Amino acid sequence: MSLEMFDKEIFDLTNKELERQCEGLEMIASENFTLPEVMEVIGSILTNKYAEGYPGKRYYGGCEFVDEIETLAIERCKKLFNCKFANVQPNSGSQANQGVYAALINPGDKILGMDLSHGGHLTHGAKVSSSGKMYESCFYGVELDGRIDYEKVREIAKKEKPKLIVCGASAYARVIDFAKFREIADEIGAYLFADIAHIAGLVVAGEHPSPFPHAHVVSSTTHKTLRGPRGGIIMTNDEELAKKINSAIFPGIQGGPLMHVIAAKAVGFKFNLSDEWKVYAKQVRTNAQVLANVLMDRKFKLVSDGTDNHLVLMSFLDREFSGKDADLALGNAGITANKNTVPGEIRSPFITSGLRLGTPALTARGFKEKEMEIVSNYIADILDDINNEKLQENIKQELKKLASNFIIYERAMF
């Protein structure tokens, strides 16, 4: 029996989501379009197999084939990131980070991470997260120019003396200097942990410096700029840390791994290792630079005055409207983005004075400089006349026509 016959409600909603993804423009920086091959294996019989433990050391029988699958995923991950050890079992980036903390430090120890309101992530010590409840957290941020001042990070680190420093961000448009972070960590005897969830796809293509050999441990998601399935990974070059990480993930915080997702990670890594991937990642950055340049030419303020990676962060501190207003206006025109706090923030985190835009998903559809220039100017048009609902509807129809030339999926399920 087909899904349509068995559960028409879910079938219909999934197809409505397909329509939304195909007809609108996805510009949330953390979202992307994965491969049909990735979705195909996620929907496979591998979902049936329990495989607690690691390849060759399982608690259940019948794991000979999933052992080979996980080993493939591990080897491809190691080759991709040029590292010696990899754990591909974390179910998410947050769980990967939780596993790193559990492996490297003890509850109550101090961690130093980027402030959430400055572009960090919940799992980097935010008080509302378990990372901010289980561990004592302190923070560094960006200056009013939107950039990290590494001397200030050094001052904070020397004063606070954390056991672990987290570098990585969810809304930082500039290159992260991993070598500088390692210098600071070494000065105080701390671990350096790099969370590259947002930039991993650029890192493996040589479009952003690698955290290796500087970081003791590196984590990432496998979606975002990697375009794989939703999930997490942890990597290191230190064998002793690798053993601790493996124990922290299983049996520490997870039970049976999701073998259908691990297989999908392996498929994604195969794509990331191809020459085609390097072309894609380069275009992601090029498209982001086009977006940044058009918006600045149209007199909009960007945090750090540009971008080095896949995202731009707009600041509306000099405007009467908020990030939430901009988010809603673009949404009315078929462009999905997200409101975001900015340096010098004057509004609440639920309103914000910024907007985060990313190019990975549009690039996955085949958008290049020409299309990005069109889209960027439409964004500026909308924000220049933010209450003009008729304009938003007209642009929505124009973008729908543009999107129809770049259909990413012909069907909702694979």
Swiss-Prot record:
Positions of modified residues (N6-(pyridoxal phosphate)lysine) = 224
Q: Which Pfam families match?
A: SHMT
Where does the UniProt annotation locate this protein?
Answer: Cytoplasm
- Which PROSITE patterns does the entry link to? SHMT
* Residues carrying the site annotation Plays an important role in substrate specificity: 223
Residue positions binding (6S)-5,6,7,8-tetrahydrofolate = 116, 120-122, 240, 348-350
Write out the catalysed reaction. Answer: (6R)-5,10-methylene-5,6,7,8-tetrahydrofolate + glycine + H2O = (6S)-5,6,7,8-tetrahydrofolate + L-serine
Q: Which cofactor does it need?
A: pyridoxal 5'-phosphate
Q: Which UniProt keywords apply?
A: Amino-acid biosynthesis, Cytoplasm, One-carbon metabolism, Pyridoxal phosphate, Transferase
**What family does the entry list?**
Belongs to the SHMT family.
Q: What is this protein called?
A: Serine hydroxymethyltransferase
* Gene transcribed to yield this protein: glyA
